[in-house]
Design a protein with these regions (language model features):
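Structured surface interface patches that mediate subunit assembly and partner/cofactor docking
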Residues: 2-157
Length: 157
């Protein structure tokens, strides 16, 4: 974190896949730590208490919408869905243009579990409409080759 704090937030850094801004680089490291930490919580069957920092991971999940499709050699369906999530303390977080046709709504934790490939979207309480139906099963907020979602296991929540 010390080295990153000395960089301009918009400075481009090389990484796997496209270059990233220093801010996105730091967010991606937070996402990786959270996602792999979730693997440990799941292994131990312990429920995690999330904080407002989850918003950074949700933001990364939203901003990688088009990249998710490009990474698979597909064209992203437009428009980009409106995403409205409830944070851990009940606050509303939203991205995009409000729409009743192309949207994702639900808990931020569910969304973050989906975009980090920890859970299939059908195993959450996320509501999807329009272009979000094609997106969420593929959604991937990390660099590298496409990774498939875990197989749906039926509603867990």
């Amino acid at each position: 974190a010390g080295a990153l704090s000395n960089l301009d937030a918009k400075a481009r850094l090389p990484w796997f896949g496209p270059t990233m801004s220093a801010r996105s680089f730091a967010t991606a490291r937070l996402m990786e730590t959270w996602a792999h930490g979730q693997d440990i919580f799941d292994l131990l069957s312990v429920r995690r208490k999330n904080s407002a920092r989850l918003k950074h991971i949700a933001h990364l999940g939203v901003t990688t919408y088009e990249w998710t499709f490009k990474n698979r050699g597909l064209s992203a369906p437009l428009p980009i869905p409106y995403v409205c999530l409830q944070g851990p303390s009940g606050e509303a977080w939203s991205w995009g243009v409000s729409s009743s046709v192309d949207l994702v709504t639900g808990m931020a934790e569910d969304f973050c579990l989906v975009v980090t490939k920890r859970q299939h979207c059908l195993d959450t309480q996320l509501q999807m409409m329009g272009s979000a139906i094609a997106w969420l099963p593929l959604a991937q907020c990390f660099a590298g080759p496409p990774v498939d979602s875990p197989a749906p296991r039926g509603k867990l929540v």
